[in-house]
């Protein structure tokens, strides 16, 4: 059983927690009736072991086992500093 590990890129919107960040994932979807492409945003709590991220950074994250009630993603790399 080879499951592909989910990785996403997003923008850090909060780094006020210890060893945790909040990342906004933006995706574009087509409206079911009107057909217009619209933006949808999902907020995820991400584990940041070394507190290396600041608000505004572009980061790559991957899914992992649940670390707390709301955290099941971990930081892979900082793609671009703010």
Curated annotation (Swiss-Prot):
* One GO MF term attached to the UniProt entry: rRNA binding
Superkingdom field: Bacteria
Q: Where is it found, in Gene Ontology cellular component terms?
A: cytosolic small ribosomal subunit
Query: Keywords, A to Z?
Result: Ribonucleoprotein, Ribosomal protein, RNA-binding, rRNA-binding
**Signal peptide: which range, if any?**
none
Q: Which SUPFAM superfamilies match?
A: Nucleic acid-binding proteins (SSF50249)
What InterPro entries does the record tag this protein with? NA-bd_OB-fold, Ribosomal_uS17, Ribosomal_uS17_bact/chlr, Ribosomal_uS17_CS
Q: Which one Pfam family would you cite for this protein?
A: Ribosomal_S17
Q: Which GO terms describe its biological process?
A: translation
Kindly indicate whether the keyword NADP belongs to this entry.
no
Q: What does this protein do?
A: One of the primary rRNA binding proteins, it binds specifically to the 5'-end of 16S ribosomal RNA.
Q: How does it assemble?
A: Part of the 30S ribosomal subunit.
The protein here is known as Small ribosomal subunit protein uS17
Q: Which organism is it from?
A: Aeromonas hydrophila subsp. hydrophila (strain ATCC 7966 / DSM 30187 / BCRC 13018 / CCUG 14551 / JCM 1027 / KCTC 2358 / NCIMB 9240 / NCTC 8049)
Lineage summary:
Bacteria, Pseudomonadati, Pseudomonadota, Gammaproteobacteria, Aeromonadales
